[in-house]
Structure formats: C-alpha cells, structure tokens
Amino acid sequence: MKKSARLRIDSKGKIYLDVFFEKTEKEKKIEGEIIGLDCGYKKLAIMSNGDTIGKELQAKIEKISRKVQKSKAFNRALIERNEYINKELKQLNLDTIKEIVIEDLNNVKHGTKGKIRKEFNNKLQRWVYCYFFNRLEQHCEVVGVQLHKVNPAYTSQTCFDCGDVHRSNRNGELFKCRSCGYTADADYNASLNILNRFRPQVHMVPVHKNQLEKCNIFL
C-alpha cells in the first residue's frame, strides 16, 4: 500500500496532517449468505438473519436534539454518535456474509422511517443513515462483501408472509398484518422485504418465534 503525507496550516493557525494512500480492493466473496438490512429509529440496523446492532441509537439521537445547534456540546454529541456507530459496525459479523442488500437512500423521503415528525429530528436521522451507510460501504470493501441497493417503497408496510400492503400493518416497532395476522418486529419484517426485493424468485421463511425473542417484542 503506497502512502504519502502532507503537513498544512489553515488560515486560523490550526495544523493538519493529511495522509494519502492507495489501497487494493479485496476480491469479492463468492460464497456465503445474502442478507437484507434495514435501519430503524430505535435500532441502528436489523438484519434478515435476525442480528441487531445499535440498540442505544435513539438515546444518542435524542441527546443531540437537546443540544443547541453548532455549540460545542452539540458537536461533542455528534462525535459521540459517530463513535457509537463505528463501534457497533465492528460488532457486525460478516464472516459468513457475501452480500448485503440495503435501501437506496436517494428514494428515502421525510417521515418514511418510524414516527419522527420534527424537521430537525428528520435531519438528524438522515445524517445517521448517510453516515452509517458510508461506513458500512467502507467496511464491506475491506472484507470483500458486495453491497446492493433497492427501492425502499413500502418495505415497512408490506407483509413479508402474504404480501399485503397497508399503512395500518405497522404500528411503531410492531408489524401485525391486517390480512394474515403475521406478527414480527417492524424493522425485521422490512429487512426481509428488502432482501426479497433483491431476490424476488426466492421466498424465504421468516423466523417467527426466535426473531420476536431477539427483538424483545412482547405480545
């Protein structure tokens, strides 16, 4: 890996060390599992294989929202949030994963995730998605995992079990199909739809009991 460095001083007298390097992209995996991944408001991400990371995300976002924008405390909270996301990403076990399917952020609009209503919180959440997906993309490149994007339309309202689409199917963190009665964590159900949208020819069997236990859904 070729490296070079440059020391520079900005107009305010701050000193920066810029490090440049060329890296060789790791060969993509040809064997392994393909999973869907959905970002939530209370959880950073939940996967179609049942794994969940970032269960303290909501607390981090709410901490930022209480700070005065552009203040030192606000900036510290942002740094803390980013460090938390980086730490949680390291907990994501990709040893047996060859491909990850996520939503295309270009199609995500205000209020499509959870029940965030205030404009500032909407911005905070979009920042989280952008930062997380950028870091995830970098992480995948390092370990040779392919990343795919699909249209997110109605993934949170569609029943993975029977295909019924209706906004009443989702109530906060709980998904309960009005048509067939299928019940699951809402983000987990969305992760299955995301994966199925990438591989529509394969209809997987959702993990009912185990997934409800993993996501702490009490019915």
Where are the model-predicted features located?
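Short amphipathic beta-strand and strand-loop transition segments with alternating hydrophobic
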Residues: 3-10
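Positively charged, low-complexity nucleic-acid-binding target-recognition regions
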Residues: 24, 121-123, 127-219
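Generic structural signal for short, flexible, solvent-exposed coil/loop and linker residues
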Residues: 6, 34-36, 74, 89, ...
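A sequence-composition feature that detects small, non-aromatic residues
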Residues: 5, 45, 59, 73, ...
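Short low-complexity stretches enriched in small and charged residues
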Residues: 1-2, 103
